[in-house]
A protein has these predicted regions:
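Conserved acidic
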Residues: 21-528
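Gly/Thr-rich phosphate-binding beta-strand-loop-beta motif of the actin/hexokinase/Hsp70
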Residues: 1-21, 208
């Protein structure tokens, strides 16, 4: 199917100019004129803006306030004059039966992106369609997201049909779903050190970690389930499980810094404490990992266990699709972005609410994947004998360390790789600045420039002139600011840095100059 690019420019004084790559255009300050153009300017084509939210913002600003409130609530029965109207952030703009989509998410771009010409948008649109075709998921006219294209394809439908759902297990075993859910939602994201590394900080991650772990999971329809309050031989030999109990992580243990066990610590953040942790539920793999590497011990109360049925060769419901997506990454950088996004979003859908016929919710699988990622990091740290002073940060499926390691001989799905040794600034668990990464819309280069200009400051910001999107206006608590052309500040503050940490720092940088010139070590939270 054809795809047509669109561009919208705000000319001021209420006038908007909308142009399509097929040569159609309109310039008007009248909402009906603009909606009529969007509705009727092209036929039999997929229509795209690069940044859908930016384009929609100027149109939304013209909508009368009572109707705008309904649009903001995703009301599907809104009519503006003779035009049915629907808009969903980052997904779709619909006028009548004519739909518009955004390309930005396919390219993995952050919130703010450079302005791209209409010809450039058309080239990107053509690339997206060609890439989806080459990946076998191009048989759709709904470009709401990469995973939506996958779900609409025959490949996606067959994949979802073959994934066991949580509610399909015996009702007598439903409690294991609650155990799994309580063992989940514990991403390991920590800053062990804060400071500036111009070199000598190596970024390691496990390639397509969640996809790799999913590919190894057994089909639960080939398994038996049971609950036990003893950790006997049968329980120890289980394939999977979720155990309720309490960990004691050795405070002075040689490998306590490698612990995969996450709990709520300071500032209500998740972190890796040591000492006697409160009773919680953990995956069996976490218990095995802690005990195997001498990190601590576990006082078992009870748990749910899973093993393959005797005489049954287990199936692997995620194996084919995850390997397929990984192989398709080689097509192009765009294909790599799309394939990675689909794989991770399929995993994410394992804990989405069961609100549609194509729901694949399965708390067991999701908890096994996320806890498995933490255990993989522990295994990497222990087997490479990473010392506490060499570990700088952990970020879900990877680490940054100060020791150079030999590249592994194995590659492929789930292998460890070193992405390089890049200048990096670490400020807090979720503020790691390296290359063009943009935590909170600030880059490594931005920080250097701002600190060099004001070395003694503790607060920095830069501004970008953009239209306020509906999502941003909602976050501001005032939807009527949508479409307003305003300076959107991106801030970088050292004030209150303690409140961003999940570990104990005896000292922290107070100025930009101190941040760039020093490094700051931390200690874990100790539970009594």
């Amino acid at each position: 199917m054809r795809i047509t690019a669109y561009d919208l420019q705000d000319l001021g004084d209420g006038y908007l100019a909308i142009q399509s790559s097929n040569g159609q255009s309109v310039v008007s300050n009248d909402l009906d004129d603009l909606l009529r153009f969007l509705r009727y300017s092209s036929k039999d084509t997929i229509r795209v803006f690069f940044d859908l939210d930016e384009a929609a913002a100027s149109v939304l600003r013209k909508i009368p306030k009572p109707l705008l409130e309904r649009v903001a609530d995703h009301d599907t029965a809104v009519n503006i004059g003779e035009h049915h109207f629907f808009y969903y952030h980052d997904r779709v703009l619909q006028v009548g039966w004519t739909r518009y989509f955004g390309l930005k998410t396919f390219y993995g771009y952050p919130e703010y992106v450079p302005i791209i010409s209409l010809d450039g948008v058309q080239e990107m649109a053509d690339e997206v369609m060609a890439t989806l075709d080459r990946m076998g998921i191009g048989d759709t006219n709904l470009l709401t997201s990469a995973v939506a294209c996958f779900e609409a394809s025959e490949l996606g439908k067959q994949t979802y049909a073959g994934i066991p759902k949580g509610w399909e297990i015996s009702p007598a075993c439903y409690e294991i779903l609650d155990y799994a859910d309580q063992a989940d939602h514990k991403d390991w994201v920590e800053a062990r050190q804060i400071g500036h590394w111009e070199s000598g900080l190596y970024d390691w991650d496990k390639t397509s970690c969640y996809m790799a772990l999913a590919s190894k999971l057994y089909d639960l329809r080939d398994c038996e389930f049971w609950k036990s309050d003893t950790m006997g031989k049968r329980e120890q030999g289980a394939s999977y499980g979720f155990a309720r109990g309490s960990f004691y992580i050795y405070p002075d243990g040689e490998r306590s810094h490698c612990s995969p066990i996450v709990a709520t610590v300071v500032n209500d953040f998740l972190g890796n404490p040591v000492g006697r942790l409160p009773v919680d539920i953990y995956s069996l793999e976490e218990v095995r990992t802690v005990e195997r590497y001498g990190i601590g011990e576990f006082d078992f109360i009870d748990g749910w266990f899973i093993k393959t049925m005797n005489g049954v060769a287990p199936r692997f419901p995620f194996k084919d699709i995850m390997n397929y997506l990984y192989q398709k990454r080689a097509i192009s950088p765009l294909a790599s972005s799309i394939a990675k996004g689909i794989g991770n979003q399929v995993v994410g859908k394992l804990i989405q609410k069961r609100d549609s016929d194509n729901s694949i919710r399965n708390e067991i699988y999701h908890a096994l994947i996320t806890s498995g990622a933490r255990c993989e990091i522990t295994k990497f740290l222990v087997e490479n004998d990473i010392q506490v002073e060499e570990l700088v940060s952990i970020q879900t499926d990877g680490v940054r360390i100060t020791r150079e390691l030999s590249e592994p001989t194995r590659n492929g799905l789930g292998s460890w790789r070193c992405n390089g040794d890049f200048p990096t600034i670490v400020v807090s668990p979720r503020k790691v600045y390296c290359q063009d990464k943009k935590p909170y819309r600030i880059t490594y280069s931005d920080i250097l420039d701002m600190v060099n200009e004001h070395p003694q400051s503790d607060r920095y910001s830069k501004k970008a002139e953009r239209h306020i999107t509906l999502a941003q206006a909602k976050a501001m608590g005032d939807i009527y600011r949508v479409g307003e052309y305003a300076s959107a500040p991106a801030r970088f503050d050292l004030l209150g840095l303690e409140s961003e940490q999940c570990r104990i720092f005896s000292k922290l940088p107070r100025t930009g100059k101190q941040l760039l010139a020093n490094r700051y070590n931390s200690e874990p939270v100790v539970f009594d």
